[in-house]
Design a protein with these regions (language model features):
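Bacterial N-terminal signal peptides
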Residues: 8-16
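Subset of outer-membrane beta-barrel
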Residues: 24-320
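Sec/Tat signal peptide C-region and signal peptidase I cleavage site
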Residues: 17-23
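Bacterial N-terminal signal peptides that target proteins for export
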Residues: 1-8
Length: 320
């Protein structure tokens, strides 16, 4: 009986993945606070100039489960010009982001180039505005189609072959930032996938809205608390609401816990060196649509190009 439920769960997983692929897949990133500029171009350069990356193996142990690779580079022109406090005094930043996501018969490669500009509102507040151009190439492997795919009149015609689809669109975002907190709103695919070339095997490409916010506080010289929240809504999939809480100890390592409401819980840890921070996250299902066998592993790395991971003031917190 257990074997029967296991096989049934895998079948439901593959069906759910393929159903979403015909419209637009959702890419989960549980360490979302380390990759703010990918979700909102207005937050480009918020943590200074850095190279970032992650590897995410979702539902490990299940064939065809999502697997994601990400790398980005952010450049804050305020740091280049030698500003004493570039996060506050700087005005412009640029980023290049690349994400590759594999799920079942689909492999998606996304490239985003973003630019952000800042307007100083008060002594400690900035209003950040950003825009980005995204290019996506989605490749369909007809040799990896499932039985559900073959019953679909659009996907079934690609059995045994390969097909590619390209989409060009735009992202926008704005954010209110402070050294201790931020609140932002971003939108991906503003044009709704209006610029498409190649074979159109995805039947809809709706825009998605993303709200992010966070607060951090140094409780003592050796302890800091960091809280982040993330909400994403899109027409053809369920809303996604995530929360993360971390404790940074001695400015050298952190421990945390997070949740994707009604879906999954995660445990996280990481270390900071002079310029580098490395994190690991273990996620397990707790209910909802994806309460299926298999857990998720996520590895992250951030390398500061110009700034060391040391406090400039007593109440500064080094990570989000």
């Amino acid at each position: 009986m257990k074997k029967f439920y296991y096989i049934l769960a895998i079948g439901l997983l593959m069906f759910g993945m393929n159903f979403q692929a015909k419209s637009q897949t959702r890419k989960y990133v549980s360490n979302f606070s380390h990759f703010q500029s990918y979700f909102n171009p207005g937050l480009t350069g918020y943590e200074g100039s850095a190279v970032r990356g992650f590897v995410r193996n979702q539902w490990s142990g299940i064939e065809g489960a999502p697997r994601s690779y990400f790398v980005s580079a952010e450049l804050d022109f305020g740091e280049l010009s030698g500003e004493m406090d570039p996060a506050l005094m700087g005005k412009n930043a640029l980023s290049v982001n690349m994400l590759q996501d594999t799920y079942g018969a689909f492999r998606e490669t996304e490239l985003i180039v973003s630019y952000a500009s800042r307007v100083r509102l008060t002594e400690k507040h900035n209003l950040r505005l950003g825009a980005g151009v995204s290019y996506q190439n989605i490749r369909l492997d007809g040799n990896a189609l499932t039985s559900e795919d073959l019953n679909d009149p659009t996907l079934g015609q690609y059995l045994g072959g390969f097909s590619d689809m390209q989409v060009v669109d735009f992202n926008i975002g704005l954010a209110l930032t402070h050294s201790k907190y931020y609140l932002s709103y971003g939108m991906h695919r503003v044009g709704g996938g209006a610029i498409i070339s190649g074979d159109e095997f995805i039947d809809s490409y709706p825009a998605s809205s993303i709200i992010q916010g966070g607060y951090r506080e140094a409780l003592s010289p050796n302890v800091a608390l960091i809280f982040n929240a993330y909400y994403r809504t899109q027409k053809d999939v369920n809303d996604n609401f995530e929360l993360n809480l971390k404790t940074l100890l001695m400015d050298r390592f952190w421990l945390g816990v997070g949740t994707r409401v009604n879906n999954a819980t995660n445990l996280q840890m990481g270390i900071l060196t002079k310029r580098l921070r490395i994190g690991y996250l273990f996620e397990f299902p707790v209910g909802g649509d994806y309460n299926l066998p298999g857990n998720t592993h996520e590895f992250t790395a951030v390398f500061n190009l110009f700034r060391d991971n040391t406090r400039r003031t007593d109440n500064e917190v080094l990570i989000w």
